[in-house]
């Protein structure tokens, strides 16, 4: 049996169709809360859609979803999508609460490259259907093609 992980999501990955486009999988999810963190927006975004980031914020809690049992190939694709090699995001181990239980998980939090661009709030409702379609039909296929060229 392959090793799987849980991943806390709070932004574009809240949309199951975005996760499915990246990973080719549908995941069971739980509503979850990540303590001492807050979702923020960016003043500039490389995408046509508004992009969120997750920052540490003592005493605050961020609502999100917990993707359950994500396998290695999907994690590799999600890592690539979140550009952890570029410093845009960092992958960090966290503890989240869901259904009255604590879960160990990973999340993609703001990296050093995006710190200067934190600005305001971000809500899923800010992403239009057209922007979501652009991410799914244009951005993700290009990303997956680039990922394929990096596979040994």
Give names to the regions the model predicted.
Residues 1-152:
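Glycine-aromatic micro-motifs
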